[in-house]
Amino acid sequence: VRRFHELFFTLSPDKSAIEGNISRALLLADKSAYNYYRDFSEKGYYNRIVAGNINQVVQVDSVLCDFDRYPYAVRTYARQMIIRATNVTERSLVTVCRLLNTSRSDDNPNGFNIEGFEIVENKDVTTRKR
């Protein structure tokens, strides 16, 4: 779950790097994550990252997982830093999903597939000048 968030939400102003990381992230999840990618892409989010020379870094604070019931319910708390030429914005990111057991592979070494991925919160916390 941590690796998925790092791949999906850490972006650099390089189109091929974005596509590579997103592709690797989507190998760990079902269509719910792809739907977010498609929505962000259609709204021009990734193009604005590249055009604005913006770096976005995610730091996962905690991953809460209920291993008592299957599929395993997960809630992830993270911080996003959106680094622009003139300012840095810190955002709060909270997501939920479920984990399904799956075969381990080179692309998915932990053997879990993320399903029902949903962004619950993604709001600005602070913005400071650079």
Q: Positions of the model-derived regions?
A:
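Structured, amphipathic secondary-structure segments that form assembly/contact surfaces
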Residues: 9, 13-130
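Juxtamembrane and targeting peptides
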Residues: 1-11
